């Protein structure tokens, strides 16, 4: 019944009295405007469009002389309108700021006194006291026109007020020349439908009818539908703090890599790109928290976008999803390459130069395939906005590939660790034996510190519960707000994701790094490269303590190449002439 959802504008005329003397009018009259000099203009503010008329004239009851001032005022009244205290609240507030204007009427037409008193009484009864403080001071019901006094005004007949927000009577008008415009109640009370053909859909508070399924209700944009405001504040604080720490530590690691690139050759070079991925990953989170919130407040103040019945996918949201998903998979790919390089160095005796020759292949494998999952999610239309974090998500499209990459990396990590232990056991207690043990401990510790939190974050993401909609209500009494979802899975996911990224910067944390920065900052004597110091220290030791080329170094007495690839912070623990590759 399309006619059941029509908004009725009742214009009461004082034909002889007002036309003769224009006395007794308390409505908004354009200053200096005569009966034939009224300047009508289209209503340009989206929040007050669809009232049943589309032309207005200024100044209004608040004294605004342009629509921008009125738009800023209506944006401040959004919480009161969206509270659902009265289904007529939107019409009353908008008509007070954008009165009706038509060439057939000599002055702008405001709402009637009875309508104002009805809406104010309903809101006083249903709205919280803090929301009633938003009631505009310029909207004095006693000063509005009254039909009983033959004053021109707009009134919604009381007999159309039926449960469900659907008027029961046919559209009527009390004035000539004013057309009947059908209008749903979707902006009048919380939970109305977003489209005119769904006007009969009843939804809980902070929900609106789905334009795709008339039996479902979707969350309204920027409202507390599935999560409370405290949950959102907690997640925002957590993301902001961890992202800042992750950005600083990974940036420090990147600067260290850049300052001394010769210290970090293969097989440890993939850590550089692992840090780069998480540095950019933290930047994405920081951008969404800092700039997105500012843009959201700007939209509320200037455009009233909170009046939208539902949250749609926006280009910034999609961009954040593609970027974070891509960087997550790139990081998992570089973790796999990192473990693979150590495996090839320790088990297959690949040299650093051999791994360097295949760096191009590593880059292709790490940067190109991760594009597929987020693009597939977009093509399959599986991306949804997240109410809790304000970012977009597509469950399973990133988590499952990342989990596979992490498990493959764990396999090569275990194989590499076993090979390192076997090689270490072949050495007698010498300087090389001690340094080799340090390499293995550092490799295993770093792998554990990265794999554990990152895998925990992926598992938490798989366990996270998402909700897109709720069933529509059959009667107003059944429209109860759903129980808020738990925010713990999302908070755990965010925590472990950013902690895992932060710990990637630990690879450069060593005494050599401290000495290098101290020398560069001129804190001790003449600045000297730590690389030169290491070379001098290595030259002062006998070669038999640095290379494993003699029979006395092996328990079996055989001459075997022990290690061909790892040069941990320039500790020379292998003989390049013994490389098989």
Swiss-Prot record:
Pfam families, alphabetized: Frizzled, Fz
Keywords: Developmental protein, Disulfide bond, G-protein coupled receptor, Glycoprotein, Membrane, Receptor, Signal, Transducer, Transmembrane, Transmembrane helix, Wnt signaling pathway
Residues carrying covalently attached carbohydrate according to the record: 54, 206
PROSITE patterns per the UniProt record, alphabetical: FZ, G_PROTEIN_RECEP_F2_4
A Gene Ontology term for the protein's cellular component: membrane
Signal peptide bounds: 1-19
Keyword Signal tagged: yes
Residues spanning the membrane: 238-258, 271-291, 322-342, 360-380, 394-414, 443-463, 489-509
Intervals, Extracellular compartment: 20-237, 292-321, 381-393, 464-488
All ranges on the Cytoplasmic side of the membrane: 259-270, 343-359, 415-442, 510-581
GO BP terms: canonical Wnt signaling pathway; establishment or maintenance of cell polarity; non-canonical Wnt signaling pathway
Membrane topology, record value: Multi-pass membrane protein
FZ domain segment(s): 35-156
GO molecular function, one term: G protein-coupled receptor activity
Tissues expressed in: Wing, leg and eye imaginal disks. In embryos, expressed is seen in brain, proventriculus, Malpighian tubules, anal plate and visceral mesoderm of parasegment 8.
Subcellular localization: Membrane
Cystine connections: 40-101, 48-94, 85-123, 112-153, 116-141
Residue ranges annotated as motif PDZ-binding: 579-581
SUPFAM superfamilies membership: Frizzled cysteine-rich domain
Record remark on domains: The FZ domain is involved in binding with Wnt ligands.
Family listed: Belongs to the G-protein coupled receptor Fz/Smo family.
Function: Receptor for Wnt proteins. Most of frizzled receptors are coupled to the beta-catenin canonical signaling pathway, which leads to the activation of disheveled proteins, inhibition of GSK-3 kinase, nuclear accumulation of beta-catenin and activation of Wnt target genes. A second signaling pathway involving PKC and calcium fluxes has been seen for some family members, but it is not yet clear if it represents a distinct pathway or if it can be integrated in the canonical pathway, as PKC seems to be required for Wnt-mediated inactivation of GSK-3 kinase.
Protein name: Frizzled-3
Lineage: Eukaryota, Metazoa, Ecdysozoa, Arthropoda, Hexapoda
């Amino acid at each position: 019944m399309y006619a059941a959802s029509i908004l009725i504008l009742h214009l009461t005329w004082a034909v002889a009295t007002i036309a003769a003397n224009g006395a007794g009018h308390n409505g908004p009259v354009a200053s200096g405007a005569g009966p034939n000099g009224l300047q009508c203009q289209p209503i340009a503010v989206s929040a007050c469009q669809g009232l049943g008329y589309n032309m207005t004239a200024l100044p209004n009851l608040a004294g605004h002389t342009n629509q921008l001032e009125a738009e800023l005022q209506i944006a401040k009244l959004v919480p009161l309108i969206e509270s659902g205290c009265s289904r007529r609240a939107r019409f009353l507030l908008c008509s007070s700021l954008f009165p009706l204007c038509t060439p057939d009427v000599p002055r702008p037409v405001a709402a009637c006194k009875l309508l104002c008193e009805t809406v104010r009484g309903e809101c006083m009864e249903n709205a919280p006291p803090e929301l009633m403080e938003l009631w505009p001071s310029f909207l004095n019901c006693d000063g509005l026109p009254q039909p009983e006094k033959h004053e021109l005004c707009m009134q919604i007949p009381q007999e159309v007020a039926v449960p469900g927000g659907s008027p029961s009577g046919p559209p009527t008008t009390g004035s000539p020349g004013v057309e009947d415009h059908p209008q749903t109640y979707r902006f009048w009370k919380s939970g109305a439908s977003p489209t005119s053909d769904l006007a009969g859909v009843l939804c809980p508070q902070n929900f609106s009818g789905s334009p795709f399924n008339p039996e479902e209700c979707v969350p309204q944009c920027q409202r507390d539908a599935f999560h409370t405001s405290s949950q959102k504040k907690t997640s925002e604080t957590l993301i902001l703090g961890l992202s800042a720490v992750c950005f600083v530590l990974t940036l420090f690691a990147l600067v260290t890599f850049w300052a001394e690139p010769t210290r970090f050759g293969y097989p440890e070079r993939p850590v550089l790109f692992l840090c780069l991925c998480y540095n950019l990953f933290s930047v994405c989170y920081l951008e969404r928290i800092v700039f997105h919130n500012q843009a959201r407040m700007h939209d509320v103040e200037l455009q009233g976008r909170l009046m939208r019945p539902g949250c749609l996918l926006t280009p910034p949201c999609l961009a954040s999803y593609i970027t974070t998903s891509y960087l997550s998979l790139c990081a998992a790919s570089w973790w796999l390459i990192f473990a693979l390089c150590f495996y090839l160095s320790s088990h297959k005796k690949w040299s650093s130069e051999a791994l360097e020759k295949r760096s191009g292949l590593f880059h292709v494998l790490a940067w190109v395939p991760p594009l597929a999952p987020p693009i597939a999610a977009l093509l399959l239309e599986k991306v949804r906005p997240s109410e809790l974090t304000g970012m977009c998500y597509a469950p399973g499209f990133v988590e499952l590939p990342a989990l596979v990459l992490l498990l493959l990396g764990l396999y090569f990590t275990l194989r590499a660790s076993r090979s390192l232990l076997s090689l270490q056991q072949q050495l007698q207690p010498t300087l090389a034996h001690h340094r080799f043990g340090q390499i293995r401990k550092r490799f295993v510790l770093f792998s554990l510190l990265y794999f554990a939190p990152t895998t925990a974050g992926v598992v938490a993401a798989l366990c996270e519960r998402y909700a897109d909609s709720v069933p529509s209500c059959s009667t107003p009494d059944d429209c109860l707000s759903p129980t808020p979802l738990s925010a713990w899975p999302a908070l755990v996911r965010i925590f472990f994701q950013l902690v895992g990224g932060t710990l990637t910067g630990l690879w450069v944390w060593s005494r050599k790094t401290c000495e290098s920065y101290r020398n560069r900052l001129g804190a001790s004597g003449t600045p000297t490269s730590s690389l030169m110091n290491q070379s001098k220290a290595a030259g002062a030791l006998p070669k038999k303590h640095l290379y494993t080329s003699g029979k006395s170094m092996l328990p079996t007495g055989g001459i075997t190449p022990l290690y061909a690839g790892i040069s941990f912070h320039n500790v020379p623990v292998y003989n390049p002439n013994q490389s098989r590759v």
